[in-house]
């Protein structure tokens, strides 16, 4: 685990995992924090973010809920997300806090807007140089459109191809695309897993086992 010390670790949590009564998420977060890995959670919506903050804090950790307007973290650009400002995330994680981000933008003029949590998680992972980006999905990974068997590993190019395949469930395509773009932006690896599986957040760090689908491979980091 020493190779991951001081690194950001982004978890895109879905509603199934956020409200699971027997979830090991809080103990996984404690484990990561105890090894100086810096988790950042992206919730599916505001109510799930509030629930996660309560659950994490009741377990003895220190979680802080954030919206996109906090420190202008998630600036709105057109109808989407602009270049994020990760300073507040870095300040919190460096001081032992676990940020829980709700996917809302900051609009300097007009109303803030809802953002897609997969897009937010990918952008945060890239901006914080995260060692991992984990996307929770009830399917537990990416099924092969031809056989329905879960795919163990994909390159970013393969993942982007599947993200455009209409045979793949629509709500999974966003996670696949975000995982691929995160890796292309410099994240070492991204996983799509079922967040309800025990210790799914950390098993890949400790073993060579993939519990879902991993996206890794060529990295294309582009400058501003």
Residue ranges and their predicted role:
Residues 1-224:
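C-terminal catalytic "cap/lid" subdomain
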């Amino acid at each position: 685990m020493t190779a991951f010390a001081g690194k950001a670790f982004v978890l895109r949590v879905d509603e199934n995992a956020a409200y699971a009564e027997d979830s090991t998420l809080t103990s996984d977060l404690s484990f990561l924090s105890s090894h100086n890995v810096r988790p950042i959670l992206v919730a599916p919506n505001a109510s799930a973010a509030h629930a996660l903050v309560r659950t994490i804090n009741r377990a003895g950790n220190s979680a802080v809920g954030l919206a996109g307007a906090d420190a202008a973290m998630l600036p709105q650009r057109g109808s989407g997300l602009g270049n994020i400002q990760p300073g507040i995330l870095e300040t919190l994680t460096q001081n032992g806090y676990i940020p829980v981000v709700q996917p809302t933008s900051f609009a300097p003029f007009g109303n803030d807007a809802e953002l897609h949590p997969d897009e937010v998680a990918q952008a945060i992972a890239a901006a914080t140089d995260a060692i991992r980006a984990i996307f929770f999905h009830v399917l537990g990974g990416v099924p092969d459109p031809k056989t329905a068997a879960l795919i163990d590993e994909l390159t970013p190019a393969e993942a982007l191809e599947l993200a455009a395949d209409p045979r793949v469930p629509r709500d999974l395509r966003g996670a696949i695309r975000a995982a691929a773009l995160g890796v292309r932006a410099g994240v070492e690896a991204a996983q799509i897993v079922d967040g309800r599986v025990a210790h799914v957040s950390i098993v890949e760090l400790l073993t060579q086992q993939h519990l879902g689908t991993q996206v890794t491979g060529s990295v294309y980091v582009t400058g501003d």
